[in-house]
């Protein structure tokens, strides 16, 4: 678990020396949260999506992207339903700082892995009907994270697009292959031997990734190579996913800002 202080300067302070394309956070969305930028070459110009919030029943839809010289790729989504209230912020160009409070302790632990091993800054605050079970919160958190990823990626110019990583954890080993293609698909080959890890229903692992895939538009293959400890299998999965996603979202300098597709476009449509 990351132990560094989780400090978020305001957006105006973070970009005081330059004009920012980001509006102030909407009223009622909580305190403004910004992530420290990780610098790139001066010739690299990104398109950053404007942070968006959703109403009841939505998954979070990013507004049209605007030209920006801001290095960090940020996504923010607020998803509110009768079952859950979820607020997600993600910085693809972060330093691995996590601040998660989902009401599901084991999921908080897994989101720490996503941040730490992906070097993403991840902020997730959620409340929900966990007195029934964790299903709704688990699903809606994943839907919001997927939408925030989609938003932060923008038009995906210059990224590697593909990621592949195998992570071991003691006797467990899990392989993850992904493509930020805009085409949602999940193949999940996990064999988790117990029904629960702590209070967490292990059936929710596959459902988490299916929900994330649906809104992010990625193709994701998960294959368990070894393992007989449920905690180790799930944690190895999140670690491998984090490293594969980091690889896919990082920049290929040889592309010089071009879209990594022979079609010339990567989108959900």
From Swiss-Prot:
Record bears the keyword Ribosomal protein: no
Cofactor: record remark: Binds 2 manganese ions per subunit.
Pfam families tied to this protein: IGPD
Binding site for Mn(2+) 2: 135, 139, 207, 232
Primary enzyme class: lyase
Keyword Transit peptide: yes
UniProt GO cellular component terms: chloroplast
Catalytic activity: D-erythro-1-(imidazol-4-yl)glycerol 3-phosphate = 3-(imidazol-4-yl)-2-oxopropyl phosphate + H2O
Residues annotated for substrate binding in this entry: 83, 109-117, 135-139, 161, 183, 231-239, 261-263
Name of the protein in question: Imidazoleglycerol-phosphate dehydratase 2, chloroplastic
Organism: Triticum aestivum (Wheat)
